[in-house]
Every structure is written in C-alpha cells, then in structure tokens.
Amino acid sequence: MSVYRGALALLVCLFAFSATALGAPTLKKAPNDAVTCTLPDSNAEALVILSNFYPGYWWDHTDLTIAVQAHPSATDEQLDAISDAIATWSSTLEDCFGGLITLTDVTGSKRQAADIVVHFVPTAGGVVFGGYALCGDHGCPNILVRSDLPPSLDREPNDPEYLGWVTLHEIGHALGLGHTTNLLESTDLMGYGWPDLGDPVLSDCDVDALAFVFAWAINGTEPAPPGEGPYDCSLD
C-alpha cells in the first residue's frame, strides 16, 4: 500500500476563515449548462474552493501553461506518467470547456515562465507528503511530487501509475480545487480515499467546480475571485 497524504496546509483550509471578497461572481447558468462534457460521478460530497482561504489563489486568465522540471535520476516511465497526467487535464479542459480554459504543456520552452511548474524530486517530502502544491498570487510555480519513501520505512518506491495520480491531484489544486469535504473516504481525484478504496475518479463534480472557479470567464466578465464555497457536488 502506498503512503500518500497531500499538503497539510490544504487540509487545514477545510476549517479556516474565509477570505473571499464580497461581490465575487457566481455562475449565471447551472454548471452542467456551462460544461460541455460528461464525466463519471464520484462519491465526493463537496469540494473546497482554495481562493476562499488563500487570497490571490485564483486565475485571472484562462490560457494556462504548465512545465515539468525533473530530477536527473527520473526514469522514462516516471516522466511519461507526469506527462500523461498533464495531458489528461489538458484534454479534459478542452473537452469540457470548448477551448475557453486551456492547459498547454510548455516543458523545454524558454520563451516564458510557465504558470504552473511541476517539480519531480524522487526523495522530497520524507514521510510528510507525496505531493504538494504551493500556489499564490495568480500563479503556481511549485508543485512538488515524489516517488521514493525513506529507507527506514522499508517500502518500494511508488510506481509510475501512482505518481501520475498524485500529479493529477496536485494539478487539480493548482487549478483552484481544494479537497473533498468527505476527505478520507472519497475516491474522487481530490479526495484521499484512493488507492485503498479504489482508483481516483476525475469526476463530473471536479469540472463543475472548475466552472464555479472560472465563473468570470464563463460569464464573459472581468476576472474576479470565485464565490463562496465549498462547491456542492449535488448541484451537478
């Protein structure tokens, strides 16, 4: 069984004081009208909206870029897993928002800094975390994912499939999604129930919550932080 717990700071946000600005936009249409794809349901009850707790933790543009910076020891299989996770989010956004919200992999490009940067450091985190998204003022330059556990635990490194799942989860944080409110039992991608209770599910609620996060873009208005969460998955 793999050991993974995401950033502890994001767990604390479940009960933190909300810093959402008054007058934040809400969707003028139901999320299922704004989203143009059909994804599986999950057992998530609601999703925390991170900008409610971290001012500036939202995007003021929708043409997002992402890049990978990997440790020299990274294997091809590990790099492929991270790349596949990015491609999954990229294609999901394209399918679900019709090009309105995009995520482009610019790994290796020197033209400009990416909005989101995934750092793969095999031994980072010790026993504390398997992935961590440190985001802030309209940017997320520090997603950290790892594969190797400390030797004292006497466990094999996490396999590439699991590394890909962690990367998917952390990119979800970078886009603005917090954890599920039923955190420990949920197998939604943004929960902690996987893999013990089943494979993670990139769900209908995840993309509907992103429609909530990017309400300003969907409504065609000026950029503004999301409304008050958590996003209730029963609304989709």
Annotate each language-model stretch with its function:
Residues 1-8:
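Bacterial N-terminal signal peptides that target proteins for export
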Residues 9-18:
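Bacterial N-terminal signal peptides
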Residues 21-77, 216-236:
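Disordered inhibitory propeptide/activation segment of secreted metzincin zinc metalloprotease zymogens
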Residues 24, 139-154, 161-162, 178-236:
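Metalloprotease/metallohydrolase-associated module, dominated by Zn2+-dependent proteases
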Residues 66, 89, 169-172, 190, ...:
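Divalent metal-coordination and catalytic microenvironments
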Residues 78-183:
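Metzincin-family zinc-dependent endopeptidase catalytic domain
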